[in-house]
Amino acid sequence: MDCAYERRTPPTEKECLALMYENKVDEHIIAHCQAVAKMVQIILLELSCTNVLLDEDALLSAALLHDIARKEKNHADVGALKLKAMGYVAIGTMIATHMDIEVNVNAPLNENELLFLTDKLVSEDEACGFEKRFEKAFLKCEGNLEAQKNIMKRLNATKMIIKKIENLTGKVFHYG
């Protein structure tokens, strides 16, 4: 019998940290997740003057937990399944798309897109420009055309999400 609830209150920051320790997540991965959550807060503050509706608590919890399965193959899917099994369906859904996402430019900005983006604006536990992050990824995968194709897809998704934010705020995006 599946005991997951359709909707649970998102875990607090303290509860997220406890879940990370319970899942034996390394300190440097926890620090990365905390930096992503800080970036989420910065962008949410910028978006507060817009009419975009987001589940901010769930998004912050997803940021803190997005790499809960980082050491496992297909960590986004594995992490998503873990959170969904605990009853955090919305958070699991966000985590599932933090590595790869399909962006609909005609749809409103959503939590999945913000989690994807903020993860790309943080390297280790430091904010960085997405261009720098993707440049490093391209160099790392030099000669691997399939990997470079996937990186280019992620770069394009990042740019589309940034454009959505710029359209909402009327400002040039300058984070990371």
Features from the language model and the residues they span:
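Charged phosphate-binding loop/patch that engages nucleotide di/tri-phosphates or the phosphate backbone
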Residues: 146-176
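Short, well-structured alpha-helical segments
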Residues: 30, 34-37, 56-60, 92-99, ...
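Residue-level recognition of alpha-helical structural elements
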Residues: 25, 29, 75, 107, ...
